[in-house]
Every structure is written in C-alpha cells, then in structure tokens.
Regions:
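Cytosolic-side transmembrane-helix boundaries in multi-pass membrane proteins
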Residues: 1-46, 218, 225-232, 302-343
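Single transmembrane alpha-helix segments in multi-pass membrane proteins
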Residues: 45-110, 134-141, 275-289, 322
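Helix-loop-helix "hairpin" substructures at the membrane interface of multi-pass membrane proteins
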Residues: 93, 112-113, 117-121, 127-132, ...
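Transmembrane helix-bundle core of multi-pass membrane transporters
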Residues: 143-207, 233-236, 255-264, 315, ...
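Transmembrane alpha-helical segments in multi-pass inner-membrane proteins
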Residues: 245, 256-321
Length: 343
C-alpha cells in the first residue's frame, strides 16, 4: 500500500499534468484565433482565384489591391492608437480630407512648392489633433462627441475654403512618388503604408509608449496610480492619429492628383471595420498593427472578388457595414475569453 506521501505526490503530479494540458489547450486556442483571419484571407484569395483566374489573379489586379488600400491602411493604423488608449477618433477621415485639400489648394491653385504644401497639410493635422486632445483632456468632453463635432467642422471648413469643385493639377513629383513609380510592379504607396505598419508594430510591441497606451486603455485609474500621465498619453494618441491621417491625405492627393470636397470621407467606416476585425487576429484581444493590415486586405479582397463576379457597387457598403458589426462582436468575445483564460 502506498504511503500518504506517495499518494500526495501522485495527486500533485496529476494536478500538474492537468494544468499543463489546460494551458496547452488554451494556447492552442489562442494560436488558432491569431491565425484564423490570415487563413480566411488566403482562403478567399484561393476561392476567387479559382472562380476568376484570368482577372482576379492577374498581376494588375493584385498590384491594384495592394496599392489602392495603402491610404486605408495608414488611416486604420492611425485609428488604433487612440482606440488602444480607450478613445475614439471620428474626425480621422475629415483630417484626410483636410490634408488632401490643403495640398491641392496650395500647390495646384496657389502655386506653392509641393514640399511646403505637404508641410502645411501636416500642420493642419497636428492642429486638429491638439484641439481634439485639449477638448477631451482639459475640458473633459467625451472623445466620441469631440471628434464627431470636429470632423463635421473640418469638413465644412474644407468646403468653405475649397468650394464645391474638384481641384486638380497637383505636382507630378508627388503623383510620381506615390502611384507612378513602382518597385516589384507595385506602386510606392503600398511600401509607405508598410513602413507605417512596421513603425506602429514596433511602438506597440517594444516601447514604453506602447505599453502605456495599453495600460491606459485597460484602466485609467490603475494607470494613474501606476504613475502614468494618463492625460498626456490620451492627448498624444489623438495627435498621432491626426498626423497619420494627414499623411494619408498626402497619399490621397498623390494617388488621384486632385482633391474633391469629399476626398477621404469614405474611409471612416472601413477604417473602424479593419481596426476591430484586426483586433481578433495576430494578437487577439488587442488592437495591433499587423492584424489591422491583414483585416484591410481581407475586406478589400472579398469586395474585389464579389465585384469581379458581377456584384453591384453597393456590395461595398454592405460588406463594410456587416464586417464592422461582426468585428466588434467578435472582438468583445475574444477579449472576454482572453480575460477568462488569463484568470
């Protein structure tokens, strides 16, 4: 008959094995969640490639998909910065409009050097971000209300200074640097977006700023008690989002060679859809750079494939709207599951 000590040892060993099995299953579930969206993207490419091999898999179409969404990638990456800190920025698409319009007005209409027009465009984004932060942090207004109002104001301001006509004739130097010049057959705009993605990934993963954003987003009071300057972090996140939106506006102007009174406004819903869908991939439960990039291209791949199959243009709104609802729901589920698994 085994002794009491031997029996206790066997029990402890069984408990340890059970714990390892549970952790292994949880980690396997986490891995599956992390790669589910990339796998779905690959599956969508294969399906549409089989259905429309002559058009969908053409180098021209693939290059178009990668380059045309560079602006959305930059906007969505900007959006996840305040989202990580627990704030919304509904003015981000309007800042794209402001930036593109300033480049067009100053360069094409007034004849300013393109570099100076771009500098003013970034200054415009900086000012919007600073005002957003001041209203949210210093006065205490909810970021949703502030940025909704700011976005509406900026849109009206652009229509006031630029009129209702499309402004064309932007310098060829910008157009060449964004959409004409290519590397490996893909316009440079795609690579600019990937540089932003790498920088965002590095900041979120390896810097104190990224860790502070995450802590503030998880609990502002806990962050404050930990010595983090919560107001500065939130303010900085709104400024960073506006600066990236300004960069996206410059890319928008370079891509089209013009700016209209609505340039970039259509990016708001897709950016939110990509941000929340991306929070379910790569690093599930967190807004993250590569998940956002994959989400952008997953969504546009689906839309492009459906349109090549004959779907009408309204499928884009249906797709993005449904994706946003699904992504937010799934993101909440993943966060709750991670919280339960970590407990």
């Amino acid at each position: 008959m085994p002794s009491v000590e031997e029996s206790q040892t066997n029990v402890d060993s069984s408990d340890a094995e059970a714990g390892k099995t549970a952790r292994s299953r949880w980690l396997s579930g986490q891995t599956l969640e992390a790669i589910a969206l990339p796998l779905a993207w690959v599956a969508v490419i294969i399906i549409f490639g089989l259905l429309r091999p002559e058009t969908f898999l053409s180098s021209a179409n693939l290059s178009s998909i990668l380059a045309s969404q560079a602006i959305l990638v930059v906007v969505a990456l900007g959006l996840i910065i305040p989202l990580t800190a627990g704030d919304y920025d509904l003015s981000i698409a309007s800042v794209v409009l402001l930036s593109a319009s300033l480049v067009a007005i100053l360069n094409a209409t007034l004849g300013w050097p393109i570099w100076l027009a771009i500098l003013v465009a970034f200054a415009g984004g900086l000012i919007v971000g600073l005002i957003n932060g001041a209203l949210v942090i210093l006065i205490g207004i909810d970021s949703l209300i502030v940025t909704l109002g700011m976005g509406t104001f900026v849109t009206g301001f652009v229509q006031f200074i630029g009129g209702s006509d499309t402004i064309s004739g932007i310098s060829d130097s910008l157009v060449n640097a964004v959409i004409v010049w290519r590397f490996l057959g893909i316009p440079l705009s795609f690579y600019y977006a990937m540089v932003v993605a790498v920088l965002a990934w590095y900041v979120f993963t390896y810097t104190p700023v990224g860790r502070r954003l995450l802590v503030v987003g998880r609990g502002r009071e806990v962050a404050r008690l930990s010595g983090i300057r919560v107001g500065a972090v939130r303010w900085g996140s709104l400024v960073a989002a506006s600066l990236l939106a300004a960069f996206a506006g410059v890319l928008y102007a370079g891509t089209s060679g013009a700016a209209s009174p609505t340039s970039g406004l259509e990016l708001l819903l897709p950016a939110f859809a990509a941000a929340f869908l991306g929070a379910t991939a790569i690093n599930p439960g967190r807004f993250n750079a590569w998940g956002t990039v994959v989400a952008v291209y997953f969504l546009v791949t689906g839309i492009t494939g459906l349109q090549l199959l004959g779907a009408q243009s309204y499928v884009q709104n249906l797709f993005y709207g449904a994706a946003l609802i699904f992504a937010v729901t799934l993101s909440q589920f993943v966060r709750k599951r991670r919280a339960g698994g970590s407990a």
